[in-house]
Amino acid sequence: MAGTNKSYFHLHMISDSTGETLIMVARAVAAQYANVTPVEHVYPLVRSQKQLDRVLAEIEEAPGIVLFTLLEKDLVERVEATCKDMNIPSLSIIGPVMELFRAYLGRETSPRVGAQHTLNAEYFNRIDALNYTMMHDDGQHVEGLEEADVVLVGVSRTSKTPTSIYLANRGIRTANVPLVPGIPIPPQLETLKKPLVVSLHATPERLVQVRQNRLLGIGAGAPLPGRGEDSYIDSRSVAEEVAFARKLSAKYDWPLLDVTRRSIEETAAAVMKLYADRQRQHG
């Protein structure tokens, strides 16, 4: 309802695929309205009129904004007509983009036989990447590193795990290995040929800050990998860790990526660019 003073609103998202793109766009916009909370209703894999019946019935029960990514013309027209009858706003997220392509290319879209199978293949590829990434987190199962697309290395608290998971959600099989002074790196890491190895690093000051926050969260005295609590947050020790990681990265010619002021999304985007560049170089 236009001009509502409620602290929440219903946000309906309809997709004929996984709905990931739709959710990302919707949340990015909703985040700009800090005082209003969206109640999300996500309807993935909607590909028939029968499936749409259920969706439209739920929208009628809780009217709100309707966003959709549907390719079937009949489904699009029905969503738009029904929302108009209900007097609620609706918008195709891909419609304007397709119109832009159509105007620039001067041609209509051509039906792609098996296009949905391609979408399904991409979905299962992401699932496979996630499974691999979770199995190869924090230096686990190093014997399988050669099967990775990307291997992230770095000292503690350089966002290796969350970046790995983000990349896996893009279908990139990602392993991560911690670099700890005094502990030899896995021999498998020295002989990798297929994967791109990227070294994540941050300033000692930033690492100390992040690690102090972590200790506050888990409680003092919690076990830390390969070190005591004092050295974990000691400025000099952390600076030595950073220097150690840089020296190791130079030795093996691993590209360095500074994550000091980067969000997880920005770090992942930078890694994906390095990965894409490498793919092009290797044909």
From Swiss-Prot:
Its EC number is 2.7.11.32, 2.7.4.27. This is Putative pyruvate, phosphate dikinase regulatory protein. Bifunctional serine/threonine kinase and phosphorylase involved in the regulation of the pyruvate, phosphate dikinase (PPDK) by catalyzing its phosphorylation/dephosphorylation. PANTHER family: PYRUVATE, PHOSPHATE DIKINASE REGULATORY PROTEIN 1, CHLOROPLASTIC. It holds the Pfam family Kinase-PPPase. GO terms for molecular function: ADP binding; ATP binding; phosphotransferase activity, phosphate group as acceptor; protein serine/threonine kinase activity. It catalyses: N(tele)-phospho-L-histidyl/L-threonyl-[pyruvate, phosphate dikinase] + ADP = N(tele)-phospho-L-histidyl/O-phospho-L-threonyl-[pyruvate, phosphate dikinase] + AMP + H(+); N(tele)-phospho-L-histidyl/O-phospho-L-threonyl-[pyruvate, phosphate dikinase] + phosphate + H(+) = N(tele)-phospho-L-histidyl/L-threonyl-[pyruvate, phosphate dikinase] + diphosphate. ADP binds at G154, V155, S156, R157, T158, S159, K160, T161. Keywords: Kinase, Nucleotide-binding, Serine/threonine-protein kinase, Transferase. It comes from Afipia carboxidovorans (strain ATCC 49405 / DSM 1227 / KCTC 32145 / OM5). Belongs to the pyruvate, phosphate/water dikinase regulatory protein family. PDRP subfamily. The keyword Nucleotide-binding applies. The lineage of its organism: Bacteria, Pseudomonadati, Pseudomonadota, Alphaproteobacteria, Hyphomicrobiales. It comes from the Bacteria. The keyword Transferase applies.
